[in-house]
């Protein structure tokens, strides 16, 4: 019964994380229309493209959307990070639970 609860908890936390990631991605896509922030926020685009300044929206990396979202919408970004940590914790507990149950079965045989 505990294993089913952990699987449901893991599934729900993954869905919450994916939803919050989509929200952050959407909020960060505002970077394309905000030319002023290109040089201050699009750090990964500069690094990946090997350029000094971003001059076109096509040069902006998708990862920079998350940076822009964290800069302008920190609450949603913090919730996404917390939900990711919860996914990791739930996954760890599920793996630990399965491992402990297999050891108990193995010792009884």
UniProtKB/Swiss-Prot annotation:
Task: Describe its membrane topology.
Answer: Single-pass membrane protein
Report the transmembrane regions from the record.
Answer: 73-95
Q: Where in the cell is it found?
A: Membrane
The keyword Transmembrane is annotated on this UniProt entry: yes
A Pfam match is DUF4306
List GO terms (cellular component aspect).
Answer: membrane
Q: Which domain of life is it from?
A: Bacteria
**Primary location group:** membrane
Signal sequence region: 1-25
Q: What keywords does the record list, in alphabetical order?
A: Membrane, Signal, Transmembrane, Transmembrane helix
Specify the protein name: Uncharacterized protein YjdJ
């Amino acid at each position: 019964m505990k294993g089913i609860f952990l699987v449901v908890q893991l599934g729900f936390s993954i869905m919450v994380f994916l939803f919050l990631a989509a929200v952050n991605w959407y909020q960060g896509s505002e970077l394309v229309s905000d030319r002023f922030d290109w040089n201050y926020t699009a750090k990964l685009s500069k690094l990946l493209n090997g350029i000094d300044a971003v001059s076109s929206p096509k040069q902006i990396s998708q990862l920079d959307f998350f940076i822009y979202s964290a800069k302008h919408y920190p609450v949603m970004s913090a919730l996404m990070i917390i939900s990711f940590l919860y996914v990791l914790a739930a996954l760890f507990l599920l793996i630990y639970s399965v491992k402990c149950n297999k050891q108990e079965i193995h010792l009884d045989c």
